[in-house]
Amino acid sequence: MAENYDRASELKAFDEMKIGVKGLVDAGVTKVPRIFHNPHVNVANPKPTSTVVMIPTIDLGGVFESTVVRESVVAKVKDAMEKFGFFQAINHGVPLDVMEKMINGIRRFHDQDPEVRKMFYTRDKTKKLKYHSNADLYESPAASWRDTLSCVMAPDVPKAQDLPEVCGEIMLEYSKEVMKLAELMFEILSEALGLSPNHLKEMDCAKGLWMLCHCFPPCPEPNRTFGGAQHTDRSFLTILLNDNNGGLQVLYDGYWIDVPPNPEALIFNVGDFLQLISNDKFVSMEHRILANGGEEPRISVACFFVHTFTSPSSRVYGPIKELLSELNPPKYRDTTSESSNHYVARKPNGNSSLDHLRI
């Protein structure tokens, strides 16, 4: 049968339907189409672990009121970002009702009639608002079982009338809240690096916000595909909002760690650009999203904090000079920050997306 498989034609046919994976599921598909088959799907861990390893949960409450509390939080964030590149945060300042409304708003968008969703379907990279299935559909070796509504929310804030009616208002409200939280976290990360609180903000690390609103429909064969294949994020920092269905795993010491859902938490992770400018002090860890084996669509919202989406950008990034010494020389060459670099960076064959910049 392999000789009769025309992958390019099947990708094109799927894309031109403009209904996404959700459209396939709603139509009653009972088998995962071959374009989604991923030979690397292996939910089992490659080796046993003798200890239970968990991504830490950090309470951010009180960081503005108490120097002692702030110093404690900085120390915990430093440890988490050096060891795991991930942590969950509670008491982060984003109202829980705003988080819930955001999840519900994105669920409403993906639950709309396919003919309504089609109006937003595009692969035009010049558009700030896009809906499609798999940004890298034609480039990746296997498509993932998900659909995405994405929008550039900063530095140029979109107008409400340019966003989908069913979720535009909450997208704007949530982005305001998460931008405030990111400013706080970049202060904490700066202090964790031994720098002044405003250092990373003054490098424009919190300037750009790219919001990816994912829907992971139920998968009839979750052992054949991923919701998101193994990758790192080409951001400075990513803040992730999940519903209660889980699915996120982080690779630590060769072992896949589940990140259990917590309705009150937001997940923070280091992106490749933060690893670069911190000169490997903070680590951008590989992670993946398992296909949804449940009965209801899984929803998540990933906020990527990047420099800018104006292309090309002349801003140059390299290891922060204040972190360097004779004993800690730069590990990366300087690079310009281009909008295309902020797309998800895959690591085929275990090669880091930063390898081409490593000295």
Curated annotation (Swiss-Prot):
Binds 1 Fe(2+) ion per subunit. It catalyses: gluconapin + AH2 + O2 = progoitrin + A + H2O. Keywords: Dioxygenase, Iron, Metal-binding, Oxidoreductase. Residues 329-359 are annotated as: Disordered. GO terms for cellular component: cytosol; plasmodesma; vacuole. One of its GO terms (biological process) is glucosinolate biosynthetic process. GO terms for molecular function: 1-aminocyclopropane-1-carboxylate oxidase activity; 3-butenylglucosinolate 2-hydroxylase activity; metal ion binding. Fe cation binds at H231, D233, H287. Changing G105S: In strain: cv. Cvi-0. Residues 207-308 form the Fe2OG dioxygenase domain. It is an enzyme of class 1 (oxidoreductase). Its cofactor is Fe(2+). Disruption phenotype: Plants exhibit a complete absence of 2-hydroxybut-3-enyl glucosinolate accumulation and a decreased resistance to generalist herbivory. Changing R288I: In strain: cv. Cvi-0. Expressed in leaves and seeds. All cultivars with seed-only-functional allele have low to non-detectable GSL-OH expression in the leaves. Its EC number is 1.14.-.-. Residues 349-359 have a biased composition (Polar residues). Necessary for the hydroxylation of but-3-enyl glucosinolate to 2-hydroxybut-3-enyl glucosinolate, which is toxic to insects, bacteria and nematodes, inhibits seed germination and produces bitter flavors. Belongs to the iron/ascorbate-dependent oxidoreductase family. This is Probable 2-oxoacid dependent dioxygenase. It comes from Arabidopsis thaliana (Mouse-ear cress).
